[in-house]
């Protein structure tokens, strides 16, 4: 078929068919499968089928939080931009990123720390169900772990998929050591687009007829 004849929906549908075919009959728990496949769709990287880890009934907890009108906090404006605003609106949810907020920048300067750390501190003031989606800054995950240990914050879900070489693996393992529902990309891979893909996969399971794989 000529690409000009394919509507965006057809391209996406065919992409997911190819992903299913190339997974070779491999299966995943029903609530996790759409997440794994959407991350593969976003990255064209099948290694996520092995590296994505779901802890403490993470997918189920995430869907409950979204149905309850959760706030989704991201660590980058790129991840924020990638999360479906129509899907959030349907559920009465919202997504925020504090990284560019003047008060966060000022707090980071005063404490000699990063804006990612300061943004996690600010998140302690969020009321209602909270989902934290980290796709860039391992320092955000490390600070979040400290805040959870101190019982200053209790996310319904943490998406821990920062990418890079310094403190990334360690931060992800620190998250996995906590008793919090989490979706983590083990190893060095991840990124803001992966964080957004995970959130969209969860949202679409509720907002799209029949869900989305």
Tell what function each PLM region has.
Residues 1-30:
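Charged, compositionally biased N-terminal leader segments and the immediate start
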Residues 27-41:
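N-terminal glycine-rich anion-binding loops that anchor highly charged ligand groups
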Residues 50-65:
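A short, well-structured juxtamembrane/interface segment
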Residues 75, 158-160, 198:
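Buried hydrophobic positions in well-ordered alpha/beta secondary-structure cores of metabolic enzymes
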Residues 79-82, 138-144, 165-169, 191-195:
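Short glycine/serine/threonine-rich phosphate/pyrophosphate-binding segments
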Residues 87-127:
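Long, charge-dense
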Residues 156, 166-213:
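C-terminal functional extensions of proteins
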């Amino acid at each position: 078929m000529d690409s000009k004849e394919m509507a965006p929906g057809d391209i996406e549908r065919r992409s997911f068919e190819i992903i299913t075919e190339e997974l070779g009959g491999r299966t995943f728990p029903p609530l996790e499968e759409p997440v794994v496949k959407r991350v593969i769709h976003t990255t064209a990287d099948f290694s996520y089928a092995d590296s994505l880890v779901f802890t403490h009934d993470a997918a189920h907890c995430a869907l409950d939080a979204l149905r309850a009108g959760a706030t989704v906090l991201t660590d980058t404006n790129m991840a924020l931009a990638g999360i479906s605003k129509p899907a959030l609106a349907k559920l009465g949810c919202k997504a925020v990123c504090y990284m560019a907020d003047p008060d966060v920048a000022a707090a980071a300067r005063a404490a000699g720390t990063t804006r990612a750390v300061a943004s996690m501190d600010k998140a302690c003031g969020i009321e209602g169900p909270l989902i934290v989606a980290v796709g860039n800054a391992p320092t955000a995950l490390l600070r979040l772990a400290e805040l959870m240990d101190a019982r200053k914050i209790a996310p319904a879900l943490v998406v821990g998929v920062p990418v890079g070489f310094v403190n990334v693996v360690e931060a992800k393992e620190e998250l996995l050591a906590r008793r919090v529902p989490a979706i983590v990309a083990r190893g060095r891979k991840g990124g803001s687009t992966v964080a957004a893909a995970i959130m969209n996969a969860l949202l679409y399971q509720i907002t799209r007829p029949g869900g989305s794989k």
